[in-house]
Design a protein with these regions (language model features):
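Active-site beta-strand/loop signature of hydrolases that rely on acidic residues for catalysis
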Residues: 1-4, 39, 72, 94-95, ...
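Metal-dependent phosphoesterases centered on the DNase I-like endonuclease/exonuclease/phosphatase
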Residues: 1-64, 68
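Residues at the C-termini of beta-strands that transition into short coil/loop
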Residues: 40-43, 76, 88
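Short, solvent-exposed helix-loop connector elements
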Residues: 52-56, 81-88
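Short capping/connector residues at structural and topological boundaries
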Residues: 57-58, 73, 91
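Short helix-loop capping/hinge motifs at secondary-structure junctions, enriched
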Residues: 77-80, 107-108
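Surface polyanion/phosphate-binding segment centered on an Asp-His-Pro turn
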Residues: 85-109
Length: 109
């Protein structure tokens, strides 16, 4: 998970794989220095938008999850992002598909 908004219990997970400081720094570098864009967050900045839930306890039912599945795009695709969602109508595994729609007519040249 990249930011605290991307997992339910970020404070207690700061030293767990998937939210370690060096992992978050790597994502920061991809986005802030290299210039890649988190396509999901272009349109959805709401909390509790997760793509993975533990199979333990009631994580799915209580939406205690992490957003660890990403669409990273180059900056010229930012304006083309037209819809984003996490498909949760069916449960296929501990991950849910992250769906991004792109409007090719809105892509920057």
């Amino acid at each position: 998970a990249h930011k605290a908004i991307d997992l339910k219990n970020w404070r207690s997970n700061q030293m767990n794989s998937g939210f370690l400081p060096h992992e978050r720094a790597w994502m920061d570098a991809l986005i802030d220095q290299v210039g890649w864009v988190d396509a999901f967050r272009v349109l959805n900045r709401q909390p509790e938008q997760y793509s993975w839930w533990s199979n333990r306890g009631q994580a799915w039912a209580k939406n205690v999850g992490w957003r660890i599945d990403y669409h990273l795009v180059t900056p010229d695709w930012r304006e083309a992002v037209s819809a984003v969602s996490v498909y949760k109508d069916q449960r296929f595994s501990d991950h849910a598909p992250v769906v991004i729609d792109y409007d090719l007519n809105r892509r920057a040249p």
